[in-house]
Structures are given as C-alpha cells and as structure tokens.
C-alpha cells in the first residue's frame, strides 16, 4: 500500500475540485491510500468523506497577487509553521511516497517534498503570463529535482511551461475528465494512466 498526500487549494465543487474528486473516486484503494489536505471545510470535503477518504484541514500556502504586503507575508510565514507541523505529523504516521499538488496555487506540497526528499507531482491547470515574476518563480519550482512528475490539463498548458529540458522530461498531458460526459472505457483508461504516475519503482 502506497500512501499519497493530495493537496488542493479549495473545498468547493468547481472545475479543478471536480477533477480531483473524480481522480480520487477512481483511484485503486487496494494499492493507494489517499490523504487529502484542504484549506477549509466545504462540499468537496463532504464528497471525499462520503468516499471514505480522510480529509485534513490545514493551510496549503496559497500564492496570490496580494500576498506581498507586510501583513499578508507575516500571515504566510505563520501558516508555513502551522502547515509543516500538521504535515510532519501526517508523514510520521503514513510515510508518504508521493505528494500530489492539484494546481500551481498551492506551494505546501513542493516545499515539504523538497525538504523531506519525497517525490512530488504537480497537476498544472494554469497558464500564468503575468506577473512575470510569478511565471519565473513557477518555472524554477517546476524544474526542481523533487518535482518528479508534471501533469498538464492541455497541450497548450504543456507548451507554455516547457521552457527548459528539466521540465520537458517530466511532463505529460492528461485531459480533465468529467464523469457524466466521459464513457466508462475512456475514464478507466484515463485513471490507469494517472495511477501509473504514482507507482514508485524500487531502488
């Protein structure tokens, strides 16, 4: 059994929220145990718990445009301390083999994975043209050795971010599936691919 920490920026049930829910519903629970970290309570938390998936509420270290004010930066650094304390306890209990960050907005996953030498998968839904500082920062984060896999929601997103060889070698496009519109065979094939990304090869 491989334990995976999933980190998401929201607890609503919109686009990326539904994508995460669909992925977790179809994950082979005989092989993988998902633990989900959300920033607050909401309908996504309830939907996940209805699938018997453990959900933990904690700061996810969300990056946003108004972060760079003295007040918000102080709050962000406090959240780092709180978030790391919670995830450290979870890691002691579950010994995660992979951390999955759903959207670029959450930084906790890559930060914790880098510090603790854990494999990290970033599911990228966004194209961020401006501010250019954010774009440069994310290119650097996506290039990190600890960020072992990148899943893009479209070819356009993949092309936008593949600015160096380090990023190119990690990426794959998997279209977001919406359960009600996707034939069963296609959904099964989609999640077979996704699950294969989680397989950690023995050293």
Task: Give the positions of each predicted feature.
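A short, glycine/small-residue-rich beta-strand->loop->alpha-helix junction that serves as a flexible
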Residues: 7-21, 129
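Conserved nucleotide-sugar phosphate-binding/catalytic loop shared by glycosyltransferases and other
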Residues: 30-71
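A short helix/loop element that forms part of the nucleotide-sugar donor recognition site in Leloir-type
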Residues: 183-201
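An aromatic- and histidine-rich active-site surface loop
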Residues: 98-116, 132
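Short amphipathic alpha-helix
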Residues: 16-28, 42-47, 139
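Carbohydrate-associated surface elements
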Residues: 156, 177
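Short N-terminal targeting/anchoring amphipathic segment
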Residues: 75, 87-106, 121
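A conserved, positively charged/aromatic
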Residues: 71, 121-151, 166
């Amino acid at each position: 059994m491989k334990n995976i920490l999933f980190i998401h920026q929201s607890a609503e049930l919109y686009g990326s929220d539904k994508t995460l829910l669909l992925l977790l519903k179809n994950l082979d629970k005989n092989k993988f145990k998902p633990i989900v970290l959300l920033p607050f309570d909401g309908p996504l938390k309830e939907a996940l718990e209805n699938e018997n998936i453990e959900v933990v509420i904690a700061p996810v270290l969300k990056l946003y445009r108004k972060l760079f004010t003295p007040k918000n930066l102080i709050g962000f650094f406090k959240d780092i301390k709180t978030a790391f304390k919670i995830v450290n306890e979870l890691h002691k209990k579950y010994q995660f083999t992979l951390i999955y960050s759903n959207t670029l907005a959450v930084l906790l996953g890559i930060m914790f994975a880098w510090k603790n030498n854990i494999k990290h998968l970033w599911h990228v839904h966004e194209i961020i043209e401006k501010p250019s500082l954010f774009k440069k920062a994310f290119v650097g984060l996506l290039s990190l050795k600890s960020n072992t896999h990148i899943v893009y929601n479209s070819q356009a997103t993949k092309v936008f971010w593949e600015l160096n060889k380090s990023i190119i070698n990690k990426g794959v496009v998997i279209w977001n599936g919406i359960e009600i519109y996707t034939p069963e065979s296609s959904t099964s094939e989609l999640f077979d691919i996704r699950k294969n990304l989680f397989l950690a090869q023995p050293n």
